[in-house]
């Protein structure tokens, strides 16, 4: 078991680039539609809720509500972009398209494929999150210098959610099961993590739950940066996101290897 699992790990530090490049070249054919699709939901939240509720709510945590909301939408866009890329694009490459099967006939291992898929999903998250951050800057909700601070956090957020979604991909029998992950995990997390309103407005039990959610850790790093404020517990938040990125990666390797060997 241990020897077989070791053989499925990444063969070296660069093989994954071939998988990333393959996905990138395929994506360039639908890049515009893909980018617009990733931006639609966060933009609706940002300008719909930001403008509508902003007029009624006023200031939240010493910031205008649209500025408060913008940071949450940056993290949310990274979450959704990496998740959807991993479940809705990776799943067919593994199954009906049999792309993974073809790649496994080369010198690449299962680990190389999974790592390449995760880095590609992280790239998609980085583009989506950065685009929303730039929109927030243009709209006057944040400063240009703040974007530089949040870029690494956007990437780490994308990697964490891509790793989590890879577990879902490994377990799901078909596309129909992805809706459970979206409605039972992603959507509640959006409202529990402080993206739309402060976590402090939640009952204490839900505040404790929010403290372990990856999106909450991401927002707690991104929001202070975009609002030009000092962030607290930086090491804790980065460490939590790293755990969400690394542990699910190895767990998904076990699950995917078991699935492909059936």
From Swiss-Prot:
User: Is Methyltransferase among the key words of this record?
Assistant: no
* Top-level division of the source organism's lineage: Bacteria
Q: Which Pfam families match?
A: ABC2_membrane
Where the protein is mainly located, per its record? membrane
In which compartments does the protein localize?
Cell inner membrane
Q: What does the UniProt function comment say about this protein? A: Part of the ABC transporter complex NodIJ involved in the export of the nodulation factors (Nod factors), the bacterial signal molecules that induce symbiosis and subsequent nodulation induction. Nod factors are LCO (lipo-chitin oligosaccharide), a modified beta-1,4-linked N-acetylglucosamine oligosaccharide. This subunit encodes the transporter.
| Similarity section | Belongs to the ABC-2 integral membrane protein family. Lipooligosaccharide exporter (TC 3.A.1.102) subfamily.
User: PANTHER family, per this entry?
Assistant: NODULATION PROTEIN J
Quote the subunit structure annotation: The complex is composed of two ATP-binding proteins (NodI) and two transmembrane proteins (NodJ).
Q: What is this protein called?
A: Nodulation protein J
């Amino acid at each position: 078991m241990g020897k077989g699992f070791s053989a499925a790990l990444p063969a070296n530090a660069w093989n994954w680039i071939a998988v990333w490049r393959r996905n990138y070249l395929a994506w360039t054919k639908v890049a515009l539609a893909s980018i617009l699709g990733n931006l639609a939901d966060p933009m609706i939240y940002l300008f719909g809720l930001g403008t509508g509720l902003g007029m009624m709510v006023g200031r939240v945590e010493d910031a205008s509500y649209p500025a408060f909301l913008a940071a949450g939408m940056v993290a949310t866009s990274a979450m959704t972009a990496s998740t959807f890329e991993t479940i809705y694009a990776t799943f067919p490459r593994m199954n009906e398209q049999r792309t993974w099967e073809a790649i496994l006939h080369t010198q690449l291992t299962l680990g190389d494929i999974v790592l390449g898929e995760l880095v590609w999903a992280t790239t998609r998250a980085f583009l989506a999150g950065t685009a929303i951050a730039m929109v927030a800057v243009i709209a006057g909700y944040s400063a240009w210098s703040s974007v530089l601070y949040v870029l690494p956090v956007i990437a780490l957020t994308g990697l964490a959610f891509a790793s989590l979604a890879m577990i879902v991909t490994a377990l799901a029998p078909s596309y129909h099961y992805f809706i459970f992950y979206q409605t039972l995990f992603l959507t509640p997390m959006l409202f529990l993590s402080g993206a739309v309103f402060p976590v402090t407005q939640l009952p204490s039990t839900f505040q404790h739950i929010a403290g372990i959610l990856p999106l909450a850790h991401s927002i707690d790093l991104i929001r202070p940066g975009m609002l030009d404020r000092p962030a607290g517990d930086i090491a804790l938040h980065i460490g939590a996101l790293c755990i969400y990125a690394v542990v699910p990666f190895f767990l998904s390797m076990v699950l995917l290897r078991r699935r492909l060997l059936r």
